């Protein structure tokens, strides 16, 4: 009844996010090494089908919760972490909450059909308007393949719009291919003539391939790839959790781009990684310029904007604990992640500048060009503003006019004086 609470909106953005919740669970499986192909099909009537080749969602009886796992997953909100077979652990780095995403999307659907291949059976589930119809069907299956296929149609009585544009799928699937190296996403999009157009997204080397694609060989410095894994915590009295990150970075004369991902979610509003990049780059590049004596006497220091103008950076991080600003996962706030990224980027930049002095020289020179051109543009803007302001100033338009003495805006006075 209130999709905005979970999906962030009851409009098309919320409907799109409900798709991402289902996709997330398939990505989690593939990232753990269970299947490397995810098929996504969009039909003209607005229905969507997502099929993975993972282990198949758990359907067996959960003794602890005294319910079947399929009920927890599809019918109970916030069941993520409760479900799971005895021999199937939860994911170390989870994108989907599995139990919030599946269940909330199911409740927001006109219908949902699920087929699960696992343990030598095909399990079938059918839901209508949030209700399971007919329980679960179990059919013996001799094939060796496993996986989950979910087809559903978002409910127009829940969302104000369910016509998800092609651009959404193309953007999301490309981004997921970028941060999930080696996983292939195959999109089939139904056309007006009922045929399907097929699109494939795959980056064997993940963010490194993506950075090279963006730069297209036209870069100031080559792409640098850094990675690390460490234990972090958000506060002294808080527990440690695991963080790993991959960073692709280059400088360009033409392109400026920063993209941050966490547990595969694109962080549209950045948060912790963005703050880390600003702090680390400003500190190290400023030191580089200062130590090489490139600042002129009394010159102002660079700002991050001067670095950003020529910086191409993509960060994909994963953690076992994450503080998102909300369920739409567009920004993270973890202090531990921010501090670790700041330290690691600082360290890698310092080593990079020492080991590649020619690149360091190019970066320092380009950042100073950006800074000085920005300052010149600002001076020109201020001078023009001053000139325009003066020309529009009514007090200076006609000489020898005396300012009004009355504070009453209803009064009007005009004095005409002959002579000087």
Can you annotate each of these PLM segments?
Residues 2-19:
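Conserved short strand/loop->alpha-helix "switch" segment adjacent to the catalytic nucleotide/phosphoryl-transfer site
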Residues 11, 62-66, 203:
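Residue-level signature of the cytosolic catalytic core of signaling kinases
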Residues 57-79:
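Short conserved segment of the HATPase_c
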